[in-house]
Regions:
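Peripheral, non-catalytic segments flanking oxidoreductase cores
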Residues: 1-240
Length: 240
């Protein structure tokens, strides 16, 4: 779609969903365009901003529902591995599709902002997407064959996550790091700039419920707690 069409559904300070082309990571602008949406509420209230395409909306909602199912199954398997089948995963904290989001990422070859717009926004960072961890429970990522995604390893430094057809990359988030008391760390990752062709990726961010409390859980870790208790609602507000 044209820039004009995309900016009709531009994110604002009061509307965090929709299109955006000046995302910041650690105060540096990322070289990407995004479209964020959530599942419409049970009362059919839709807080999303959608482009003028009914079929697009329908496909995205089906994708969201399928991603929620995969995320729930992935978390259950992760809990089984951590607790070695000693605890029913139903007794452990869950993610909540009502607070989760899908993002469509587009990494262009050049800056999507005009020269004039570039003068009034933060400068581009060295990466297409600066290094960061995701705040939630876990992230499911679909990526095309372009490459560029890297994750940080204490042993090997930055490691390329090579695209593999039909695969889903799973990143653990900050919530899981807290629940496991640092036994499992949130994945520090970034995206390198693309040079030959644009890159597309689609993450599903599986987040705790709004009223969820984040604290180390004895069922998932040993030793003294390294985090104090705090609410997800407060944490995500501080991250924005």
């Amino acid at each position: 779609q044209s820039t004009i069409a995309k900016r009709k559904i531009m994110r604002t300070q009061t509307q965090p969903l929709g299109y955006y082309d000046r995302e910041l990571t650690k105060q540096q602008r990322d070289l990407k365009e995004v479209f964020d949406f959530m599942k419409p509420r049970a009362d059919h209230t839709d807080i999303n901003q959608w482009p003028d395409s009914t079929s697009f909306r329908e496909v995205m909602i089906r994708f969201f529902d399928a991603s929620s199912t995969v995320a729930e199954r992935t978390l259950a398997l992760l809990y089984r591995a951590i607790t070695r089948l000693q605890i029913d995963s139903a007794e452990l904290p869950a993610g909540d599709p009502r607070t989760s989001t899908v993002r469509l990422n587009y990494y262009p070859l050049s800056d999507p902002l005009s020269t004039a717009e570039q003068t009034t926004t933060p400068s581009l960072g060295a990466q297409a997407l600066g290094q960061h961890t995701d705040p939630g429970v876990l992230t499911l990522l679909l990526q095309d064959d372009t490459g560029g995604l890297q994750t940080y390893s204490l042993k090997n430094g930055w490691v390329d996550i090579q695209p593999s057809p039909g695969s889903i990359v799973v990143n653990l988030g900050d919530a899981m790091q807290v629940w496991t008391n640092d036994t499992y760390k949130a994945a520090l990752h970034r995206v390198r700039p693309v040079h030959k062709k644009a890159r597309f990726s689609t993450p599903y961010f599986f987040n705790p419920g709004n009223d969820a409390v984040l604290k180390p859980l004895t069922q998932l870790s040993d030793g003294p707690a390294v985090y104090q208790s705090f609410k997800w609602r407060d944490y995500i507000k501080a991250r924005v």
